[in-house]
C-alpha cells in the first residue's frame, strides 16, 4: 500500500493545505474548511483505488463531501473497469481532516494541518462523533504510562523514560473549562502546560517526536481526531490511548449532548459493546498497513506552513508508514502552469 499510494496521498494533503492557506488570516474558518475539503476530495478521486471515508466531515446529511461512508477513488466510478484491474484493486478505509484547526487558519495562528490516515478495509475504527479522553506520550514511555494513572504518576514515568526532570516536561492541554483540574494537577506535579485552542492531532504528533519540546498530550478532545492521532503514533511506535467520553457533565461542551444512556445504547448498536473501554492505538488503527500524512497549513512544531511566491507555493509534508517503518519529511515546490519561479531558496 505504501508503494502504491505513498506519493498520491502526499499530493492529497498538499492540495488541501494550499487551498486552505489561501484563507489564512482572513477570519473565515468555514470557507477555509470548505476549500480544503473540495481540494482533498478532488485529488482522492484521481487515485486508482476504492476508498471509503470512515472518519470525515460528518454524516451524509451533515456534509456534501467527504461524509462518512462516501466512496472515493477512480475505482468507484461507473466506468471503473476501464481504469482498474480487479486483481490489483486496492480497497482502503480513509480518515480525513482536510483542515485541522479551522479557527487557527482563520486567525493566522500556528498549528493547523491537512491530515489523513489510511489502512486496508476495516483497519481504522469508525469512531462516533463524540468526545475522547486521550493520552499521547513519546516512544520511550510506550506501555509504561496509562490513561487511568493520575497525571503526576504519568509525568514521573515520562521524565524517567526521557532521563530528565518533571520540571523539564511540557504537556499540551486543550484550553477548556473541563480541564481546569487536570491543568492544576500537571502544574502541581512540576511540569509546564501549553494550552491550545484547537489542533490536538498536531499536539499528539509532536509528543511522538524527540526535539519538539512537547512531551505529552492529556485531556479530552474529539474522538474522530483521536483515531487519526492513534494511526500516526502507532506508525511512530509512540504511546496513545483513548477512552470515549459521552457524559455531558464531564465534557462541559456548552452545547446539547444526548443523555448518557441514549449514547451508550447508540454505541452498542454500532458494535461498541463496552463504551468505557480503554483503546490502545493498535486497536484504534488496527490494520496491517497504516499510512499517515499531514501537510502544514500554518507553521507548527514539525512542519512549516504553506508559503506562497510569485510562481507558486511551497509545502512541507510529513509521511509515516507502518509498512516500511519510515518517517519522511517532504519539501515540495508547486509551480503554476506556464510560470517559472523567480528563484528557489533552500529554506
From Swiss-Prot:
Cite the record's note on assembly: Homotetramer.
- Reported function: Catalyzes the hydrolysis of fructose 1,6-bisphosphate (Fru 1,6-P2) and sedoheptulose 1,7-bisphosphate (Sed 1,7-P2) to fructose 6-phosphate and sedoheptulose 7-phosphate, respectively.
Name the coenzymes or cofactors required. Mn(2+)
Which NCBIfam families is this protein grouped with?
glpX (TIGR00330)
Q: What does UniProt give as GO cellular component?
A: cytosol
> Protein name, please?
D-fructose 1,6-bisphosphatase class 2/sedoheptulose 1,7-bisphosphatase
User: What Enzyme Commission number(s) does the record list for this chain?
Assistant: 3.1.3.11, 3.1.3.37
Does the record carry Metal-binding as a key word? Answer: yes
**Gene3D superfamilies reported in the protein's UniProt record:** 3.40.190.90, Fructose-1,6-Bisphosphatase, subunit A, domain 1
Q: Name one Pfam family in it.
A: FBPase_glpX
Q: Which family does it belong to?
A: Belongs to the FBPase class 2 family.
Source species of the chain = Synechococcus sp. (strain JA-2-3B'a(2-13)) (Cyanobacteria bacterium Yellowstone B-Prime)
| Ligand binding (Mn(2+) 2) | 97, 100, 225
Catalyzed reactions: beta-D-fructose 1,6-bisphosphate + H2O = beta-D-fructose 6-phosphate + phosphate; D-sedoheptulose 1,7-bisphosphate + H2O = D-sedoheptulose 7-phosphate + phosphate
InterPro entries per the UniProt record, alphabetical: FBPase_class-2/SBPase (IPR004464)
- Cite the binding residues for Mn(2+) 1: 33, 57
- Report the pathway entry: Carbohydrate biosynthesis; Calvin cycle
The record lists substrate as bound by 100-102, 131, 176-178, 198-200
Per the UniProt entry, what are the Gene Ontology biological process annotations, in alphabetical order?
fructose 1,6-bisphosphate metabolic process; gluconeogenesis; glycerol metabolic process; reductive pentose-phosphate cycle
- Name the SUPFAM superfamilies on file: Carbohydrate phosphatase
Amino acid at each position: 500500500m505504501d508503494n502504491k499510494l505513498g506519493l498520491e496521498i502526499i499530493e492529497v494533503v498538499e492540495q488541501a493545505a494550499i487551498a486552505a492557506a489561501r484563507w489564512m488570516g482572513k477570519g473565515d474558518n468555514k470557507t477555509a474548511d470548505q476549500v480544503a475539503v473540495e481540494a482533498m476530495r478532488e485529488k482522492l478521486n484521481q487515485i486508482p483505488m476504492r476508498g471509503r471515508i470512515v472518519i470525515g466531515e460528518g454524516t451524509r446529511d451533515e456534509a456534501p463531501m467527504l461524509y462518512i461512508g462516501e466512496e472515493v477513488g477512480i475505482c468507484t466510478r461507473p466506468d471503473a473497469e476501464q481504469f482498474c484491474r480487479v486483481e490489483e484493486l486496492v480497497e482502503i478505509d480513509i480518515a480525513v481532516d482536510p483542515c485541522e484547526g479551522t479557527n487557527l487558519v482563520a486567525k493566522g495562528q500556528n498549528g493547523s494541518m491537512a491530515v489523513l490516515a489510511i489502512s486496508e478495509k476495516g483497519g481504522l475504527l469508525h469512531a462516533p462523533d463524540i468526545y475522547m479522553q486521550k493520552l499521547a506520550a513519546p516512544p520511550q514511555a510506550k506501555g509504561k504510562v496509562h490513561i487511568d494513572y493520575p497525571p503526576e504518576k504519568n509525568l514521573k514515568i515520562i521524565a524517567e523514560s526521557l532521563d530528565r526532570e518533571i520540571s523539564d516536561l511540557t504537556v499540551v492541554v486543550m484550553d477548556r473549562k473541563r480541564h481546569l483540574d487536570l491543568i492544576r494537577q500537571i502544574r502541581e506535579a512540576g511540569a509546564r502546560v501549553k494550552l491550545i485552542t484547537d489542533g490536538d492531532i498536531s499536539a499528539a504528533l509532536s509528543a511522538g517526536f524527540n526535539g519538539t519540546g512537547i512531551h505529552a498530550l492529556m485531556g479530552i478532545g474529539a474522538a474522530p481526531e483521536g483515531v487519526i492521532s492513534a494511526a500516526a503514533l502507532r506508525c511512530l511506535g509512540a504511546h496513545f490511548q483513548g477512552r470515549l467520553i459521552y457524559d455531558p457533565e464531564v465534557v462541559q461542551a456548552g452545547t446539547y449532548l444526548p443523555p448518557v444512556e441514549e449514547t451508550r445504547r447508540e454505541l452498542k448498536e454500532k458494535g461498541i459493546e463496552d463504551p468505557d473501554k480503554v483503546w490502545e492505538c493498535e486497536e484504534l488503527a488496527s490494520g496491517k498497513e497504516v499510512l499517515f500524512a499531514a501537510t502544514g497549513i500554518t507553521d507548527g512544531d514539525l512542519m512549516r506552513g504553506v508559503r506562497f511566491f510569485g510562481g507558486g507555493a511551497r509545502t512541507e509534508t510529513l509521511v509515516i508508514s507502518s509498512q516500511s517503518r519510515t518517517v519522511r519529511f517532504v519539501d515540495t515546490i508547486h509551480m503554476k502552469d506556464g510560470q517559472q519561479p523567480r528563484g528557489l531558496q533552500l529554506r
